Amino acid sequence: MTGGKKFWRSIEEYQRSDGFGEMLKSEFPSIFELWKVDRRELLRVMGASLALAGMTGCKPTRSDEAVPFVNRPESYIKGRTDHYATAVLFDGFAQPVLATCVAGRPIKLDGNPEHPAFRGGSTPFMQAAILDLYDPDRSQEPLAGGNPASWADFDGEMAKWRSEWQRSGGAGLRLLIGPTTSPTMLRQIAELRSALPHARVHLFDPLSGYGGETQQQFRPKLEAAQVVVSLDDDLLGPGAMQAINARAWGDRHGDAPREQRMRLLMAETTPTQTGAKADRRLGIPPSRLAMLAQAIAGGGEVTLTEAELGWAKEARKALQGARGRSLMTVGRFAPPQLHALALQVNQMLGNVGHTCEIAAPLGFVPGPGESFLDLVRDIEARRVSALFVLAPNPVYQAPGDVPFAEICAKVPLRVHAGLHVDETAAVSNWHLPISQSLEDWSDARSPDGLATIIQPVVRPM
């Protein structure tokens, strides 16, 4: 039997020096004498150690009985499924769903076929929203300094602060909220600002794109586009518009004749779902995306590779050949200049109002001095005495150069409201559990601007 390549562990072994063999025998003599086990025994011991380590990480859960009905309705038929129209939230926008319930408990979420924009479209995020409802790690009770407390304790604490806020007009009071399009919440924020004019409501949106919350909203209408040129814009990927865009894409590519199908040209910096569906895909570094857009717009001399130049010429020709029926989009994280250039191209081609529309923001728009960084500066300047964080987790999600856990420790009163005891809750004086969207009455707007009612399908769990 001939052996393969012979490997060596050091220069000494390769040179077969006299001292190398003695060194191997004498390096750990005590271990070799005490631990005389074979490979199988070693693996058995290691497996037992890993199993014990895993058991120590387990914790007992509450033993609750899921009783479907206390008083069963007369019309109830065992095994029958009921369906209720409601909505879940994604990035503050309503995602209309049809909840399937068995014995009074929701078991599945699907797209609502009656919604004019979604038309039954669904996404993995919409269907996975039901997992939050049954999450055993959800917060169940108020916490004061990490210890269980009652709602009466919290009301008593707030009574002391409320009189001070009413006297000072809300000076030092700050609210930090996530993206929201709820008309009811926007009205309540307006009432709070009217009652406490010195209070501030800050927006925390770590995933906001160009212009953030103050930009005019750009809404693509893929159902009307014959040619789409996308610059790192994952139209079919995760986002509030995913179900709407996927439905429009399916309509134009399902049973449609070839001449009526949408043509998609995609330039992307990382592989995406949209790029996988593109008729012509180009991989490009982020630093070269602006030059590619300039070549499409015909704005001056730019230096491109042969592949980039060929793609840009093809995209430019396709856009010009479908005036009023074409669309150029840019990813949400692209620089402002790139968004402005894409908007200019769409206006020159007559696409605005046909394949895309520009509308006012649907969600909460903070006023001057109400950004997240403004809040950080005010806290460091000791101008904040009370901070209420409603749902976001800024300690975990804030930029790396903003140590928010250390910064918010300078605020005397810190209140966090959310589904879980997360990193922000851990540094707060108070943590308050909130209801999941399937347990609560609310409202929100879908990405097309339509107001949507959110109704509970189960009592708070």
Where are these regions (language model features)?
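Non-catalytic alpha/beta scaffold blocks inside enzyme catalytic domains
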Residues: 192-193, 197-198, 204-461
